[in-house]
Amino acid sequence: MTGGVERVFLNIVSNITDKKVLILPIHQKYDDNLIKELPENVSIIKNDKYSLKGFLSVFDLIRLANYINKKVINNFEEFCVINFSDTISTIIVSCLIKAKRYLSWCHCNPSAYLGSKFFFLYKIFFKKFENIVCICDTQKKEFCKVFGDSYSEKIIICFNLTDLKKIDNLKNEILNFNKEYILMVARFDNRSKDFYTLIDAYKKLDAHLKEKYSLVFVGDGEDFEKIKQYAVLSGEYNHIVFTGLQKNPYKWMKNAKLFVLSSKTEGFPLVICEALATECPVISSDCISGPRDILMDGKYGLLFKVGDSDSLSKKMTLLLSDEKIYNNYVSTARKRIEEINSYAIASINKIFLK
């Protein structure tokens, strides 16, 4: 278990402690810190013998499903299978397990399925699920574009929950960083994130703003060195800070002047919600999907066109220069996340009380 999807899962199961939840990991890669946070109602099904360690094998998936059917589900009167990943392997296994009810969560931009060599399999297996859970309205529209309008009535909208208690416990830790800064927290992956546009936008800020505000990147990933080199070539490296992966990103959000998410594609970027929860104003690329749904088309944060560094630079300048507009976004940030959480909990109850 690693990454944002697993964090979303943890937030959900922490709100359904009256249900027995079994996790079936397909690949044996865990984040030990997340495992330690699992509530008592959650257990991990050990499947070392059948777990996938490399190339997708249909036979492995069939054997794994048969193992679950013979050894696990007989212990329960009612068994609901929820696919909580966007990979074809987890979808196939979910459909092969015998259950009373089948659901599948969609975390990604649905157009990503079109680029998969397994797209024909997605089309076949998605038909078996009673409900598809999308994490915002924009994602639902995209899913129906890709797989057909017939899915519209099967789709349940469930926003991702933000763990406000955890954020509140961590955001006030002392941060040993003495300069004001603009922040982006993300995995260094150029396929979905757009660090270059943010660096270009920062370069276009007036000199006095760059002198006052550093640009800070929190995170790590396979493209870290490429992005760092781009920062060097931009001529702004002296104003840009790469912190690497941080155990507590919330104290960085709490102390940031503003938070920027520059992405090419998203599902439902929880990092925007986390920044808003610390009352940090947000600017995000208007990518599919999530940012527009969270920020309500500018009501709770500013949006810019994907890849448009001029627009981003102007909106950064606006927030850094206009105190009235800036303070308005500060005052409404937390309220928006509490509202989203309220919607999410209502949806979770609807899903799991069926």
Regions found by a protein language model. Name each.
Residues I82-S89, C106:
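Short His-centered aromatic/hydrophobic patch
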Residues K324-L353:
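A charged, aromatic-enriched C-terminal amphipathic alpha-helix characteristic of glycosyltransferases
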Residues L245, K264:
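Aromatic "clamp/platform" in nucleotide-sugar-dependent glycosyltransferases that forms part
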Residues M296-G298, L302-S309, L318-E323:
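Conserved acidic donor-binding segment of nucleotide-sugar-dependent glycosyltransferases
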Residues G3-N11, E180, M184, D189-K204, ...:
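A conserved mid-protein helix/loop that constitutes part of the nucleotide-sugar donor-binding site
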